[in-house]
Amino acid sequence: MTELKTFISATGSEIVRASRNGDGDWKVLTLLSDKGVTCLADDPGNPGIIYAGTQKQGVWRSDDAGLTWKASGLDGQCIKSLAVNKHNSNVVYAGTKPALMFISSDGAQTWRELESFRQIPNRWWWFSPAEPPDFRPYVMAIAPSPTEPDLLLAGIEFGAVVRSEDNGLSWSSHIHGALRDCHSLKFHATDGKWVYQAGGSGGGAAVSPDLGYSFLKKREGLSKHYGIVCASDPVDPEVWYICVASSPFKAYGKFPETYLFRSDGHSGWKPIGWAPHPLHSSPTALVTIRDTPGHLYAGLMNGEVWQSCDYGDSWRRLPFNLKRIWHSLLIN
């Protein structure tokens, strides 16, 4: 396995980047400090290319693994989610508040709205209790398929999980079994049949084994049912992880109480973590690395990053702090 040397987080206000030099020392930089950075996405085919979404200042792009940045369109939009097509790195998706979808076919140089997203059935009642005073819904997650070039899913907070088979030209209604309050939505790294979800409704966890056509709620063994974030093992699609809490206040409040679990597909959820439950700083990002089974990284709201190399059975805290990790953590 290639040694990982760069960790990049979106804090909700800026980017924090930790990198290790040849002597093994870590250097932490703060970037885009005036942009209100909300989300990140990397290009799976070009590890140095990273995109950042911001509050009202559009999309930004880095070509050097997050060291320098340039504005890359959608100025004035509140970007809530970003993703790169896994088969064509020029194709980039952006989800916004209010809940709209945009696509770029040239690496975020130009953008166009996917207008059919406005026509999704029953979207009139979507709303987000998480962001007063307007409570407008937003696209919290975009999940492109690793095996089907034109297949992607989008998760709304709060409203629906929807599916497109034509690269966003048309969209389904809400997918049966999926959690309407979507917080995290991810395809498996290589097996495109599997999709995983964490959400604030329906028990907190759901999984699809059929390319996202339908979802099954997975509650057995979960002590709490407000899902915060999920991830899957990069090799075994039946192994996946979720962080849950009893409520949004226990997930994101001043005194968090959260719970981290692993499922292997053969039994209920098993508690894991570096401390007894409940954990007192929320894991808001879970990351696995392609071709490294058993490896899991947890990024916490307090900026800590914890690493497990054995499916979450044991952990070590990495020797740097990213200030705050708000849903987005990239590792190179």
Where are the predicted features?
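Beta-propeller blade termini and top-face loops
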Residues: 2-332
